[in-house]
Protein backbone atom coordinates (compact mmCIF):
# COMPACT_ATOMS: atom_id res chain seq x y z
CA UNK A 1 0.00 0.00 0.00
CA UNK A 2 1.19 3.49 -0.81
CA UNK A 3 -0.13 6.74 0.66
CA UNK A 4 -0.20 9.23 -2.23
CA UNK A 5 -1.72 12.25 -0.49
CA UNK A 6 -3.11 13.26 2.90
CA UNK A 7 -5.56 16.09 3.61
CA UNK A 8 -6.05 15.98 7.41
CA UNK A 9 -8.43 18.98 7.53
CA UNK A 10 -10.79 17.25 5.09
CA UNK A 11 -10.26 13.81 6.65
CA UNK A 12 -9.05 12.50 3.27
CA UNK A 13 -6.28 10.03 2.42
CA UNK A 14 -5.41 9.05 -1.15
CA UNK A 15 -4.25 5.43 -1.33
CA UNK A 16 -2.76 3.20 -4.01
CA UNK A 17 -3.73 -0.45 -3.44
CA UNK A 18 -0.93 -2.86 -4.34
CA UNK A 19 -1.68 -6.32 -2.92
CA UNK A 20 -4.37 -8.67 -1.63
CA UNK A 21 -3.13 -7.90 1.90
CA UNK A 22 -3.85 -4.20 1.27
CA UNK A 23 -7.47 -5.09 0.45
CA UNK A 24 -7.73 -6.99 3.73
CA UNK A 25 -6.37 -4.01 5.69
CA UNK A 26 -8.80 -1.66 3.91
CA UNK A 27 -11.67 -4.02 4.76
CA UNK A 28 -10.93 -3.24 8.42
CA UNK A 29 -10.28 0.48 7.87
CA UNK A 30 -13.32 1.43 5.75
CA UNK A 31 -16.54 1.62 7.79
CA UNK A 32 -20.19 2.52 7.06
CA UNK A 33 -20.56 6.30 6.79
CA UNK A 34 -17.13 6.81 5.18
CA UNK A 35 -16.88 8.13 1.62
CA UNK A 36 -14.78 6.33 -1.00
CA UNK A 37 -13.81 8.14 -4.22
CA UNK A 38 -12.44 6.24 -7.22
CA UNK A 39 -12.49 5.86 -10.99
CA UNK A 40 -15.04 3.19 -11.82
CA UNK A 41 -17.26 1.83 -14.58
CA UNK A 42 -21.01 2.42 -14.49
CA UNK A 43 -23.80 1.12 -16.70
CA UNK A 44 -25.87 3.93 -18.19
CA UNK A 45 -29.15 3.39 -20.05
CA UNK A 46 -29.68 5.38 -23.25
CA UNK A 47 -32.86 5.59 -25.34
CA UNK A 48 -32.23 6.75 -28.91
CA UNK A 49 -35.97 7.16 -29.68
CA UNK A 50 -39.29 6.00 -28.28
CA UNK A 51 -39.61 3.08 -30.72
CA UNK A 52 -36.28 1.43 -29.94
CA UNK A 53 -35.35 -0.42 -26.75
CA UNK A 54 -32.96 1.15 -24.26
CA UNK A 55 -29.28 0.75 -25.04
CA UNK A 56 -26.96 0.07 -22.08
CA UNK A 57 -23.58 1.74 -22.26
CA UNK A 58 -20.68 1.21 -19.82
CA UNK A 59 -19.03 4.54 -19.05
CA UNK A 60 -15.85 5.42 -17.11
CA UNK A 61 -16.59 7.92 -14.35
CA UNK A 62 -15.07 9.25 -11.11
CA UNK A 63 -17.53 8.67 -8.25
CA UNK A 64 -17.81 9.31 -4.55
CA UNK A 65 -19.85 6.65 -2.72
CA UNK A 66 -21.08 6.92 0.88
CA UNK A 67 -20.29 3.49 2.28
CA UNK A 68 -23.10 1.23 3.46
CA UNK A 69 -21.62 -2.22 2.74
CA UNK A 70 -18.05 -3.53 2.44
CA UNK A 71 -17.26 -7.06 1.25
CA UNK A 72 -13.81 -8.65 0.99
CA UNK A 73 -13.54 -11.31 -1.72
CA UNK A 74 -10.07 -12.80 -1.25
CA UNK A 75 -10.47 -15.42 -4.00
CA UNK A 76 -11.44 -12.72 -6.50
CA UNK A 77 -8.70 -10.33 -5.27
CA UNK A 78 -11.36 -7.68 -4.75
CA UNK A 79 -12.92 -5.39 -2.14
CA UNK A 80 -16.45 -4.27 -3.02
CA UNK A 81 -17.70 -1.00 -1.54
CA UNK A 82 -21.42 -0.24 -1.96
CA UNK A 83 -23.52 2.84 -1.22
CA UNK A 84 -25.36 5.84 -2.68
CA UNK A 85 -23.47 8.14 -5.06
CA UNK A 86 -22.77 11.53 -3.46
CA UNK A 87 -20.36 12.84 -6.12
CA UNK A 88 -20.04 12.20 -9.87
CA UNK A 89 -17.64 13.70 -12.40
CA UNK A 90 -20.38 13.49 -15.08
CA UNK A 91 -23.65 15.39 -14.92
CA UNK A 92 -25.58 12.52 -16.53
CA UNK A 93 -24.87 10.24 -13.54
CA UNK A 94 -27.69 10.80 -11.00
CA UNK A 95 -26.74 11.34 -7.35
CA UNK A 96 -28.40 9.12 -4.76
CA UNK A 97 -28.38 6.02 -6.97
CA UNK A 98 -26.51 3.02 -5.58
CA UNK A 99 -23.16 1.91 -6.98
CA UNK A 100 -20.50 -0.64 -6.09
CA UNK A 101 -16.84 0.33 -6.46
CA UNK A 102 -14.64 -2.72 -7.04
CA UNK A 103 -11.24 -2.09 -5.43
CA UNK A 104 -8.41 -4.30 -6.73
CA UNK A 105 -4.60 -4.27 -6.67
CA UNK A 106 -3.66 -1.24 -8.80
CA UNK A 107 -6.77 0.78 -7.85
CA UNK A 108 -6.30 4.30 -6.48
CA UNK A 109 -8.94 5.44 -3.99
CA UNK A 110 -9.49 8.45 -1.77
CA UNK A 111 -10.93 7.54 1.63
CA UNK A 112 -12.71 10.20 3.66
CA UNK A 113 -13.70 9.81 7.32
CA UNK A 114 -15.43 12.30 9.60
CA UNK A 115 -12.97 11.28 12.29
CA UNK A 116 -9.84 9.15 11.94
CA UNK A 117 -9.79 7.20 15.21
CA UNK A 118 -6.36 6.03 16.47
CA UNK A 119 -7.06 2.41 15.49
CA UNK A 120 -7.63 3.31 11.83
CA UNK A 121 -4.51 5.52 11.67
CA UNK A 122 -2.43 2.69 13.18
CA UNK A 123 -3.93 0.18 10.78
CA UNK A 124 -3.11 2.39 7.80
CA UNK A 125 0.51 2.81 8.94
CA UNK A 126 0.73 -0.92 9.55
CA UNK A 127 -0.51 -1.64 6.01
CA UNK A 128 2.14 0.66 4.53
CA UNK A 129 4.90 -0.98 6.60
CA UNK A 130 3.62 -4.48 5.81
CA UNK A 131 3.91 -3.80 2.08
CA UNK A 132 7.67 -3.28 2.55
CA UNK A 133 8.17 -6.67 4.21
CA UNK A 134 9.05 -9.80 2.28
CA UNK A 135 6.38 -12.49 1.97
CA UNK A 136 7.04 -16.09 2.96
CA UNK A 137 5.76 -19.33 1.46
CA UNK A 138 5.47 -22.57 3.45
CA UNK A 139 5.57 -25.98 1.76
CA UNK A 140 5.11 -29.26 3.61
CA UNK A 141 6.26 -32.31 1.71
CA UNK A 142 6.15 -36.03 2.37
CA UNK A 143 5.79 -39.25 0.39
CA UNK A 144 4.13 -38.00 -2.82
CA UNK A 145 2.14 -35.16 -1.24
CA UNK A 146 2.86 -31.44 -0.95
CA UNK A 147 0.77 -28.62 0.53
CA UNK A 148 1.56 -24.94 -0.11
CA UNK A 149 0.52 -21.74 1.65
CA UNK A 150 1.48 -18.07 1.60
CA UNK A 151 1.81 -16.26 4.94
CA UNK A 152 -0.37 -13.21 4.40
CA UNK A 153 -1.26 -10.39 6.78
CA UNK A 154 -4.68 -11.89 7.52
CA UNK A 155 -3.55 -15.51 7.89
CA UNK A 156 -2.55 -18.48 5.77
CA UNK A 157 -3.60 -18.55 2.13
CA UNK A 158 -3.59 -22.23 1.08
CA UNK A 159 -2.84 -22.10 -2.62
CA UNK A 160 -2.00 -25.61 -3.85
CA UNK A 161 -2.09 -29.31 -3.00
CA UNK A 162 -0.03 -31.67 -5.17
CA UNK A 163 -0.41 -35.46 -4.96
CA UNK A 164 1.38 -38.18 -6.94
CA UNK A 165 0.98 -41.92 -6.54
CA UNK A 166 4.60 -43.02 -6.24
CA UNK A 167 3.89 -46.75 -6.31
CA UNK A 168 5.80 -49.50 -4.50
CA UNK A 169 9.07 -49.86 -2.63
CA UNK A 170 11.33 -46.89 -2.01
CA UNK A 171 14.21 -47.97 -4.27
CA UNK A 172 12.08 -49.28 -7.13
CA UNK A 173 13.16 -47.67 -10.48
CA UNK A 174 9.59 -46.83 -11.49
CA UNK A 175 9.02 -45.23 -8.10
CA UNK A 176 12.18 -43.14 -8.49
CA UNK A 177 10.94 -41.87 -11.88
CA UNK A 178 7.56 -40.97 -10.38
CA UNK A 179 9.28 -39.25 -7.47
CA UNK A 180 11.34 -37.09 -9.85
CA UNK A 181 8.14 -36.12 -11.70
CA UNK A 182 6.56 -35.23 -8.36
CA UNK A 183 9.58 -33.13 -7.33
CA UNK A 184 9.55 -31.32 -10.70
CA UNK A 185 5.82 -30.61 -10.31
CA UNK A 186 6.31 -29.17 -6.80
CA UNK A 187 9.36 -27.11 -7.85
CA UNK A 188 7.62 -25.63 -10.91
CA UNK A 189 4.54 -24.72 -8.87
CA UNK A 190 6.74 -23.07 -6.23
CA UNK A 191 8.62 -21.09 -8.88
CA UNK A 192 5.41 -19.90 -10.53
CA UNK A 193 3.82 -18.82 -7.23
CA UNK A 194 6.98 -17.14 -5.90
CA UNK A 195 7.45 -15.23 -9.16
CA UNK A 196 3.80 -14.14 -9.36
CA UNK A 197 3.60 -13.11 -5.69
CA UNK A 198 7.15 -11.69 -5.49
CA UNK A 199 8.09 -14.06 -2.65
CA UNK A 200 11.77 -14.18 -1.70
CA UNK A 201 11.84 -16.99 0.88
CA UNK A 202 10.18 -20.39 1.27
CA UNK A 203 10.15 -22.80 4.21
CA UNK A 204 10.11 -26.47 3.19
CA UNK A 205 9.08 -28.72 6.06
CA UNK A 206 7.90 -32.22 6.83
CA UNK A 207 8.57 -35.37 8.86
CA UNK A 208 11.62 -37.58 8.28
CA UNK A 209 14.24 -37.15 5.55
CA UNK A 210 11.92 -36.65 2.57
CA UNK A 211 12.32 -32.86 2.60
CA UNK A 212 16.13 -33.30 2.47
CA UNK A 213 15.73 -35.49 -0.64
CA UNK A 214 13.61 -32.76 -2.21
CA UNK A 215 16.13 -30.07 -1.23
CA UNK A 216 18.98 -32.10 -2.79
CA UNK A 217 16.89 -32.40 -5.97
CA UNK A 218 16.36 -28.61 -5.98
CA UNK A 219 20.08 -27.90 -5.62
CA UNK A 220 20.80 -30.12 -8.63
CA UNK A 221 17.92 -28.98 -10.85
CA UNK A 222 16.64 -25.62 -9.56
CA UNK A 223 19.64 -23.95 -7.84
CA UNK A 224 18.05 -20.46 -7.83
CA UNK A 225 15.00 -21.83 -6.03
CA UNK A 226 17.16 -23.87 -3.63
CA UNK A 227 18.98 -20.67 -2.56
CA UNK A 228 15.66 -19.29 -1.24
CA UNK A 229 14.78 -22.37 0.84
CA UNK A 230 14.90 -22.88 4.61
CA UNK A 231 14.30 -26.43 5.92
CA UNK A 232 12.29 -27.24 9.03
CA UNK A 233 11.19 -30.42 10.84
CA UNK A 234 7.53 -31.11 11.57
CA UNK A 235 5.81 -34.16 13.01
CA UNK A 236 3.24 -34.19 10.19
CA UNK A 237 2.79 -33.01 6.61
CA UNK A 238 -0.22 -31.28 5.03
CA UNK A 239 -1.98 -28.29 6.55
CA UNK A 240 -1.35 -29.52 10.08
CA UNK A 241 2.38 -29.36 9.35
CA UNK A 242 2.07 -25.81 8.00
CA UNK A 243 0.40 -24.66 11.23
CA UNK A 244 3.16 -26.46 13.13
CA UNK A 245 5.77 -24.37 11.28
CA UNK A 246 3.93 -21.21 12.37
CA UNK A 247 3.80 -22.33 16.02
CA UNK A 248 7.47 -23.36 16.06
CA UNK A 249 8.50 -19.79 15.25
CA UNK A 250 10.33 -20.68 12.03
CA UNK A 251 8.45 -17.98 10.12
CA UNK A 252 9.69 -15.40 12.65
CA UNK A 253 13.29 -16.45 11.99
CA UNK A 254 12.82 -15.98 8.26
CA UNK A 255 10.44 -13.05 8.42
CA UNK A 256 11.04 -11.18 11.66
CA UNK A 257 7.68 -9.38 11.82
CA UNK A 258 5.15 -12.09 11.03
CA UNK A 259 1.74 -10.78 12.09
CA UNK A 260 0.04 -14.18 12.06
CA UNK A 261 2.73 -15.88 14.20
CA UNK A 262 2.55 -13.07 16.77
CA UNK A 263 -1.26 -13.25 16.97
CA UNK A 264 -1.29 -17.04 17.42
CA UNK A 265 1.42 -16.77 20.08
CA UNK A 266 -0.59 -14.19 22.07
CA UNK A 267 -3.82 -16.23 21.91
CA UNK A 268 -1.90 -19.31 23.10
CA UNK A 269 -0.55 -17.21 25.97
CA UNK A 270 -4.13 -16.31 26.97
CA UNK A 271 -5.15 -19.99 26.94
CA UNK A 272 -2.05 -20.95 28.95
CA UNK A 273 -2.85 -18.30 31.57
CA UNK A 274 -6.44 -19.53 31.84
CA UNK A 275 -5.16 -23.09 32.44
CA UNK A 276 -2.65 -21.91 35.09
CA UNK A 277 -5.06 -19.45 36.75
CA UNK A 278 -2.70 -16.56 36.01
CA UNK A 279 -3.81 -12.91 35.45
CA UNK A 280 -6.09 -12.97 32.39
CA UNK A 281 -9.58 -11.84 31.34
CA UNK A 282 -11.81 -12.98 28.50
CA UNK A 283 -15.31 -12.17 27.30
CA UNK A 284 -16.65 -8.62 27.03
CA UNK A 285 -17.78 -8.21 30.66
CA UNK A 286 -14.51 -9.42 32.23
CA UNK A 287 -12.30 -7.52 29.79
CA UNK A 288 -14.26 -4.28 30.17
CA UNK A 289 -13.83 -4.50 33.94
CA UNK A 290 -10.09 -5.21 33.59
CA UNK A 291 -9.61 -2.24 31.23
CA UNK A 292 -11.43 0.09 33.65
CA UNK A 293 -9.07 -1.08 36.43
CA UNK A 294 -6.06 -0.30 34.21
CA UNK A 295 -5.04 -3.95 34.56
CA UNK A 296 -4.72 -4.87 30.88
CA UNK A 297 -1.20 -5.15 29.49
CA UNK A 298 -2.23 -6.54 26.08
CA UNK A 299 -5.79 -6.36 24.73
CA UNK A 300 -6.70 -8.90 22.03
CA UNK A 301 -9.73 -8.10 19.86
CA UNK A 302 -11.09 -10.37 17.11
CA UNK A 303 -11.44 -8.44 13.85
CA UNK A 304 -15.06 -9.62 13.46
CA UNK A 305 -16.06 -7.54 16.51
CA UNK A 306 -15.10 -4.41 14.57
CA UNK A 307 -17.65 -5.32 11.89
CA UNK A 308 -20.47 -6.27 14.27
CA UNK A 309 -23.33 -4.43 15.95
CA UNK A 310 -21.17 -3.54 18.99
CA UNK A 311 -18.40 -1.97 16.86
CA UNK A 312 -18.60 1.46 18.51
CA UNK A 313 -18.50 -0.03 22.02
CA UNK A 314 -15.46 -2.16 21.09
CA UNK A 315 -13.68 0.84 19.51
CA UNK A 316 -14.31 2.94 22.64
CA UNK A 317 -12.88 0.13 24.79
CA UNK A 318 -9.79 -0.04 22.54
CA UNK A 319 -9.27 3.72 22.82
CA UNK A 320 -9.64 3.60 26.61
CA UNK A 321 -7.15 0.71 26.80
CA UNK A 322 -4.62 2.67 24.73
CA UNK A 323 -5.04 5.73 26.95
CA UNK A 324 -4.19 3.47 29.93
CA UNK A 325 -0.99 2.24 28.20
CA UNK A 326 -2.33 -1.11 27.05
CA UNK A 327 -1.06 -2.59 23.81
CA UNK A 328 -4.01 -3.36 21.50
CA UNK A 329 -3.77 -6.23 18.99
CA UNK A 330 -6.54 -6.94 16.46
CA UNK A 331 -6.52 -10.68 15.73
CA UNK A 332 -7.53 -12.04 12.33
CA UNK A 333 -10.42 -14.51 12.26
CA UNK A 334 -8.78 -16.24 9.27
CA UNK A 335 -6.37 -18.42 11.28
CA UNK A 336 -6.64 -20.90 14.16
CA UNK A 337 -5.59 -18.28 16.73
CA UNK A 338 -8.61 -16.22 15.70
CA UNK A 339 -10.87 -19.27 15.95
CA UNK A 340 -9.68 -19.90 19.51
CA UNK A 341 -10.17 -16.25 20.49
CA UNK A 342 -13.69 -16.38 19.02
CA UNK A 343 -14.47 -19.32 21.34
CA UNK A 344 -13.45 -17.07 24.26
CA UNK A 345 -15.93 -14.38 23.23
CA UNK A 346 -13.75 -12.63 20.66
CA UNK A 347 -11.94 -10.47 23.21
CA UNK A 348 -9.31 -11.16 25.88
CA UNK A 349 -6.77 -9.36 28.01
CA UNK A 350 -3.34 -10.41 29.26
CA UNK A 351 -3.31 -8.68 32.64
CA UNK A 352 -0.63 -6.92 34.67
CA UNK A 353 -2.27 -8.15 37.88
CA UNK A 354 -5.33 -10.10 39.01
CA UNK A 355 -8.48 -8.07 39.57
CA UNK A 356 -10.40 -10.74 41.53
From Swiss-Prot:
UniProt-listed Pfam families: eRF1_1, eRF1_2, eRF1_3
Disulfide topology: none
Cofactor(s) the record lists: a divalent metal cation
Quaternary structure and interacting proteins, as annotated: Monomer.
Top enzyme class: hydrolase
Record's keyword terms, sorted: Cytoplasm, Endonuclease, Hydrolase, Metal-binding, Nuclease
Cited NCBIfam families: pelota (TIGR00111)
Taxonomic superkingdom: Archaea
Name of the protein described by the UniProt record: Protein pelota homolog
Database matches in HAMAP family: PelO (MF_01853)
Gene it is expressed from: pelA
Taxonomic path: Archaea, Methanobacteriati, Methanobacteriota, Thermococci, Thermococcales
Subcellular location: Cytoplasm
Gene Ontology terms: cellular component: cytoplasm
Amino acid sequence: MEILEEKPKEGKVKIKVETLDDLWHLYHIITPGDVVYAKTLRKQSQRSDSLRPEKVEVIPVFLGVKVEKINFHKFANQLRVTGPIIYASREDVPLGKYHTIAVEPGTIITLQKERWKPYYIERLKEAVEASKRAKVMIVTIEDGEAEMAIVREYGLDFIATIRHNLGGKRYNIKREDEERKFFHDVAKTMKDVMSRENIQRAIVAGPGFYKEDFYKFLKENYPDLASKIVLDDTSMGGRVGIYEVIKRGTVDKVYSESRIANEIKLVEKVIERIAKDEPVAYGMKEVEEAVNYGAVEILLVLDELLKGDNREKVEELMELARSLRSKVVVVSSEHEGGEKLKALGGIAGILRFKIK
